[in-house]
């Protein structure tokens, strides 16, 4: 489970959120919706403790921001899969090697690497592209490689920051479907996006950063409708 307890989040001494109280349950699908610069990336970074609260506490799968040491942060991040908007793939290595690299760095037994890599690629429909170079793939395919890379280490949660930001509408829907498929296997998936209309067609628990507030509801109606409740004051 992930929990924010009276947490204040700042970036470069600029207040972003105040008195944030929020729980994310194991296996949950959660959207965080907000415009560029609204604070959603800060919120996502705090999940893997790249951003630490200046007050209060964040607890991520048993690791507390108050007590965790730098060495333990690396251990925590191994339990999480991170999906970036800009792919960050190694262009001089094949799709297979991009995933295998993650496993080698984390000390996975050599005998298990091929099976884990191919299983992850199969989850995103790219087992046929294992030998391809990333730059030879479409944008949507590259993002699917990024998702497979996040998945290959058997994470308890996947954190995706604008995973559809550089993609056309049809490909964006396809990427969300792959993330939902992963979530259906019991893996928590937290998605940050600026695209409210895209999320509307994929109902789930949603946080929206709107009018300098973080509000929450199941997204089945417009954000001006009933059912939204404050979660924290956002000062972005």
Language-model features: where?
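Helix-to-loop junction immediately C-terminal to a conserved catalytic motif
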Residues: 48
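Conserved signature/switch motifs of ABC ATPase nucleotide-binding domains
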Residues: 132-135, 153-154, 185
């Amino acid at each position: 489970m992930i929990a924010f307890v009276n947490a204040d989040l700042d970036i470069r001494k600029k207040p972003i959120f105040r008195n944030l109280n929020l729980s994310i349950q194991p296996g949950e699908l959660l959207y965080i919706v907000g415009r560029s610069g609204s604070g959603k990336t800060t919120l996502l970074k705090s999940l893997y403790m790249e951003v630490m609260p200046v007050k209060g506490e964040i607890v991520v799968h048993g690791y507390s921001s108050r007590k965790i040491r730098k060495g333990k942060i690396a251990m925590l991040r191994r339990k999480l899969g991170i999906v970036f908007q800009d792919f960050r793939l190694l262009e001089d290595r094949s799709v297979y090697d991009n995933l295998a690299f993650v496993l080698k760095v984390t000390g996975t037994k050599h005998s298990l690497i091929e099976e884990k890599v191919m299983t992850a690629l199969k989850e995103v429909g790219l087992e046929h592209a294992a030998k391809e170079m990333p730059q030879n793939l479409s944008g949507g395919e590259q993002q699917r490689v990024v998702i497979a890379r996040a998945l290959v280490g058997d994470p308890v949660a996947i954190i995706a920051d604008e995973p559809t930001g550089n993609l056309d509408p049809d490909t964006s829907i396809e990427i969300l479907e792959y993330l939902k498929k992963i979530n259906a296997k019991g893996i928590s998936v937290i998605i940050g996006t600026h695209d409210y209309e895209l999320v509307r067609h994929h109902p789930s628990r949603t946080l929206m950063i709107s009018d300098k507030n973080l509000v929450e509801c199941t997204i089945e109606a417009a954000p001006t409708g009933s059912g939204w409740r404050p979660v924290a004051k956002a000062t972005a």
